[in-house]
Amino acid sequence: MTDAFPRGRFVWYELMTSDPSAAQSFYTQLTGWATKAGDLADQPYTEWVNGETSVGGLMQLPDEAKQQGAPPHWLGYVAVPSVDDTLQQAQGLGAKTLVGPMDIPTVGRIAVIQDPQGAVIAVYTPTGDAPGHDETPGVGEFSWHELATSDHAAAFNFYQALFGWVKIEAMDMGPGGIYQMYGRIPGQSIGGMFNKPADQPGPPASWLFYITVPDVHASVEQVTQLGGQVLNGPMEVPDGDIVAQCMDPQGAAFALHMVKPSA
């Protein structure tokens, strides 16, 4: 591994859904993304394209995932120098391998794991350069990666060992407990982790990915108009940005993020 390899960077975001055609219509209208056919040979695959850059993919929720009780969901892929070494390490830390490892021609090697608290994430070693970047995300890009879990301290230790993530800042949310921000690079947050309230519905641990939009208030109206749900927000967070948590018409959770306007 060279210093240039982006170990621990989220590089791809994949929507597995019960109705790819309907989901494509929803997100292209909401985010302005275009789409193009992907490279998977064994099944239909669509790439989300923001400007000139592919930011993720769209596919039918696999039957085996449905049989395991998985609902439509977004799956984040994290770059690692070796998928096989990462799987071995993850298993030693208490994770389960759900899919793979497997090679995708011209793309790279991937696997899907479930962390010790139950959240699902994918690891990816690209054939060429890894997608994504570490600069401030622009409109239409994924900007924040949030883990709701049963034990955020244990979860951070797991991901720190696996991906090299570092703690950035811990924010006291009062009755909500600690919100632990983290990043790949000291001083540069890419997400947060917190303990999920016991009375909150859904799985015990899950990832939520935030998409940058120019106007979150207009976007949440559009979410509703397009058949989705606004679960929480819009609300201002401590740095002045505005966010909202949502669900698409097929039931996949996602979030919207508007950067604080410049003074």
Provide a role label for each language-model segment.
Residues 1-6, 9-18, 46-49, 64-89, 91-143, 168-186, ...:
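Vicinal oxygen chelate
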Residues 1-21, 73-78, 124-156, 162-168, ...:
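N-terminal beta-strand motif that seeds the catalytic metal site of vicinal oxygen chelate
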Residues 2-54, 92, 100-108, 147-189, ...:
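Core segments of cupin and vicinal oxygen chelate
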Residues 14, 23, 31, 37-38, ...:
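Ligand-binding pocket scaffold of soluble enzyme catalytic domains
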Residues 23, 33-35, 53-56, 66, ...:
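Short loop/beta submotifs within extracellular cysteine-rich repeat domains
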Residues 32, 56, 76-78, 97, ...:
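Short, low-complexity, polar/charged sequence segments that are solvent-exposed and flexible
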Residues 50, 54-62, 67, 76, ...:
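DNA polymerase sliding clamps and clamp-related checkpoint/processivity subunits
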